[in-house]
């Protein structure tokens, strides 16, 4: 068994009802060009593979990657053992011939830089379904004038239409984080929208 590593900010999702809720929100279809960032122990991976038929996954932890490859390598998993902050999403979208659907229970310690890395090439990304610390999701999805509205909201709003889908308690993870999480859908605009 592979244990969570603090340096990678790992908390593994294990709650089947939360997993089902996330899969329902994503609504993956056969042939969707799905990329899972940080699949960890594969909590979402199996259901995503079953729905889409194939899946690209980016995992930085070599031990987890080896386990994922052993379990899903012959079932349509295309594993990239690398740092998502250095991954070329535009090249993958070009190879697939379609805009990517990004899924991720993102490590909280790299979430903001990763979002900006993804949005450097908005034409490559269709949407993102992400789980982050609840306070970060609230800031991403904030309405102008609310107490959560701030720099992150302003920087992302031109590029995404953000929707806070649902909250996830600490008990859904092992080890349990000290904070609540939330899932959001970010629909990416190919051109920025300015108010």
Language-model features: locations:
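Catalytic cores of RNA-modifying enzymes
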Residues: 1-195
């Amino acid at each position: 068994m592979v244990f969570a590593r603090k340096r990678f900010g790992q908390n593994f999702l294990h709650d089947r009802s939360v997993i089902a809720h996330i899969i329902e929100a994503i609504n993956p279809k056969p042939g969707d060009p799905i990329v899972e960032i940080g699949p960890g122990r594969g909590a979402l991976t199996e259901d995503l593979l079953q729905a889409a038929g194939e899946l690209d996954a980016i995992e930085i932890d070599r031990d987890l990657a080896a386990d994922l490859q052993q379990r899903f390598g012959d079932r349509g998993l295309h594993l990239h053992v690398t740092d998502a902050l250095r991954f070329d999403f535009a090249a993958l979208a070009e190879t697939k011939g379609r805009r990517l659907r990004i899924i991720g229970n993102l490590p909280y310690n790299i979430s903001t830089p990763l979002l900006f890395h993804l949005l450097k090439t908005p034409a490559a990304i269709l949407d993102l379904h992400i789980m982050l610390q609840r306070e970060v999701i609230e800031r991403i999805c904030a309405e102008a004038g609310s107490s959560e509205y701030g720099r992150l909201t302003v920087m992302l709003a031109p590029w995404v239409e953000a929707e806070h889908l649902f909250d996830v308690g600490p008990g859904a993870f092992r080890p349990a984080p000290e904070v609540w999480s939330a899932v959001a859908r970010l629909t990416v605009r190919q051109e920025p929208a300015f108010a």
